[in-house]
Structures are given as structure tokens and as C-alpha cells.
């Protein structure tokens, strides 16, 4: 199968496979480690365990690329905010202080995240040289949603609070961009050779605010990666057909489709970019025949363009690891 970096750089018509959250709760070997490490942030900052977890799906499935085991919220944590992962509730961020946030310095930030960079160094040494090592960040808008605590329900935010603080929001986004670029550079220096930007809450933005809060911040990160000659994949989840405008404005090397995007529409409208993912992770709860039928929709639609086989979101904790293995085999055998 194709090397991920080569596909993104050259836009060659070849294929590759990896999955978001491929190192995670669906794997029994991960759950064994997690059961002995209650603090998720501390686990992310354990270089040896982070590297071991990163390589678990590589050892199990021989997947084409590894993605470092970490979390997008490691950045707010390194910038001094309290971050806690609560079972069955997810991440809770508290005690955001704008003055403290703006007074952070690059040296302290890097020092706090040195264990992440060490994990990347360890993983790069242990990973076959033909396999890519993906690092990642959350986009500024998505991080801001968590940092300000404006998400009221699973897919809703208090947008009036955002609108009432536009000046403060702009300041936070700009400062986040600065530290995200630093985090990206440090990860690249440690050995990562592909970057993915997760804008997980882009779909909560009204269309009229996508340019300022989604397109421009993502574009700045992409431009930074371009200067380092590192390919970058963007994932603006939930923006529906605004994917087309995003692609034109941001110009990423790769674009991860979410499960609401029709593959035929994507092929017709998303030009000069390698496509990735698309299939609903819940598909893996179905029978093998149904899984293969769904996978075929994407493999057939993208058979003559650069395509990275992945999902439209991360693998879910309830996923059967054996089904993941059979899906990878189906993909590799697909003609």
C-alpha cells in the first residue's frame, strides 16, 4: 500500500489505510494499560506508554500509518488550564483565565509537552521507516469551545456567549494559533511526518462565521505546515457542503470526510486534494457483508483518485477488533 506522506505530497492515485482512534478503547491491549492509569492526561504524558499504545494497532493489523497517542486538549493543559476526563461525560475544562492564558511563554509550554515529543521520538525509532507517523492538533475554534465551556449539549453551544465576546474570542484564537504552530513544529522535529488538524466542532458554526472562525485559522496552520514541507490533513467535521468552500479557502493536502458527506458529491466537488475517510464508524456494528457494502461505496467512488481509507470519525469503544481486521483485509483485497 502507498506511503501516506507520498500520497499527500504527490497526489498520486494510490491507496493507504489508517483509522482515527486506531489506538484506543476498542483494543483489549489498550484497556489493560488504561485500567492501571486512571488519569488520562498523565497517560498521554507517559512517553513510554504513549509510544506502546501508538504501536498497538500497527502490531495487530500492520496498518500503513501510526498516529501518536495523545489528545487535542493537551494544548489547553500545557497552557495552564485544568483538564479532566470524567467517565461517561468526557472532557471537562475549568478555570480559564484570559490574563494567565495570554501570559504563557513558549519555553514553559514546550517543557510541559516534552513527554509527547519524547513519545514521538521513541515511536519513530520503533516504527518501520516506510510507515508514516501522524501527529495532530485541534483547530483553534474547537479548542476554544472546550476552553470557554460554551457547549451546552452534545451538539449545541451557547453561541450568544461567543457573539458577546467577539474581541476576546479573536484574541484567544490568535494566541492558540501561535502555540499550535509551536506544538506542530515540536512534533515534526521529534519525527512526525504528517499532520492532521481536527476541527471537531466546526459544524456548530453558522455559515456566516465559518470564514473567520474556521477557514482562516485552519489556513494559517496549513501554511505553517507548508513552510516545513510537511503534508497536512484537515477534518472540519459537520460543515456539510461547506467542505467545498473550506477546501478552496484552506488548501490542505488532504481532506478527511465525515460520514454526512456523500462520496460521489465529494469526488465531483473537492478538487486538487487527497481525500480520506467518510464511512460511519457505526457501520462496524453491522454484519461483515453490510460493512463491506458500505466500504465499497467509498472504494468505488474514489478508485481513480488519491484516497486514504479511514472513517468519518474515530473508531468507537464498542467496536469489535476482529471486524476492524476483516475490514482492513477487505480493503487490501479490493480490486
Task: Name these PLM-found stretches.
Residues 39, 46, 95-100, 154-155, ...:
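Intrinsic-disorder/low-complexity, polar/charged segments
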Residues 112-335:
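Active-site loop segments of alpha/beta catalytic cores
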Residues 88-126:
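A gly/proline- and charged-residue-enriched helix-loop-helix capping module
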Residues 32-44, 98-109, 248:
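Short, basic, glycine/proline-bearing loop/turn elements
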Residues 1-85, 321-335:
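N-terminal basic, low-complexity leaders that serve as flexible interaction/assembly modules and, when applicable
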Residues 1-5, 110, 314:
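Intrinsically disordered, low-complexity regions
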Residues 72-75, 90-91, 140-142:
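A short acidic, glycine/proline-enriched capping/turn motif at secondary-structure boundaries
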Residues 30-32, 81-93, 146-158:
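Short, flexible, mixed-charge acidic loops at enzyme active sites
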